[in-house]
Amino acid sequence: GRLAWQCIYGTDAEPRAARTAKMNMIMHGDGHGGIHYHDGLLDINGIFNGRFDLVLTNPPFGSNVGADQKVGGSDETRVPVDAAYLQRCRERGYGTPWEESHHRLRQAADSKTPILDLFEIGKGKNNRPTELIFVERCLNLLKPGGRMGIVLPDGNLNNPSLAWLRRWAEGRAKLLAVVSLPEETFKSSNATVKASLVFLRKFTDAESAQWEAAWAQAHTEVDAGFDTQRNDAHASYAPRIVSGEDADATRLLGELAALGLQRTLPRWQRGEAPAYPRQATPTIQGKPFWLGEVAKEHKKVATELKRQATATLAGVQKRSDALLSELKTRYKAIDEAHTAALWARVRELFDYPVFVAAPKTVGITSTGETGEGVASELPDLLKSYREFEYWLAQGAHPEATPNFSEPSTA
């Protein structure tokens, strides 16, 4: 029917998994036209960006997408160009978005583009864990307001080194729910990584605008205070860096300044922020330089003083460099605190509830047993989530927060 042929699509880079999915669809009388043996990170048939209301995936853990993996470089990353395939896709009415997607992939295959370069968080990288790229892939596939569910290792949710990923996703989708799975969930598949189910909803256009407005307001409220800290740090270090904390250098520089020639440390500048995640722009500090002009009648004296000052400064260059390094370290600490303050304020302005659960049983044992005899808290969990959804729809008033019951241990 229409649901199977026009609404359900699936892809897997493991041929056996793809065949099993196709057979399952056939056995349920749903056909299998949308199921493909293909790399899930690449478009195929009706699978392309911005098309789906719902995406579900369980990406492989412990593997990486490397820069050596190219579009069209293997059977599962091929880009079909045969006339029958093109005609079939056009007859299904995928329209301009599909045409543009297929054109991009053909260009990528012709130029042997690394798969990583198709993704913002992969572009220019030597490798990325597969599950991280799948987070971006799923969000790309969704329409604005579309929902996704993904199984992720818990390290993605709490490892400090992956804070950038969480912040990246936070700026593109709302976190709906996190369900921490018990350790035995994947033991029968020889997976030892603790995992969780993560549910996200891609921003609508209105939510994207609200997110950007929150950042604009946060910058308005926060930036000036941290700029003052940068100015104070500069004022504290500048004379010491310029003179290398040497008394003779300080004296000579003072005499030159009286004649109109100064040795100065330039004001700090804002650098270029990385593409992701959002953060305060890094502070850039240049090296000392000479500034000013000496009157003609003082040039001979100034030339001699400058020669002496230059020689003296050369002797304390290491100290000056060390002080400059200290100042840059201070700037880095200010930048990090600035970023933390921005994120804290944005999260206050763009605050919303998240459903979190940690069931002890999910219908599977450590040996892979399933069925009616295996305990599962998931039905009760679903009921609780429906209550949570209803509460959100009613305005999420604190006084009406659902009082979820303890899960049954039976």
Descriptions of predicted regions:
Residues I8-D12:
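Conserved SAM-binding motif I beta-strand of class I
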Residues N49-A410:
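A conserved structural/catalytic subdomain of Rossmann-like adenosyl-cofactor enzymes
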Residues M25:
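Conserved hydrophobic residues forming the short capping helix/wall of the S-adenosyl-L-methionine
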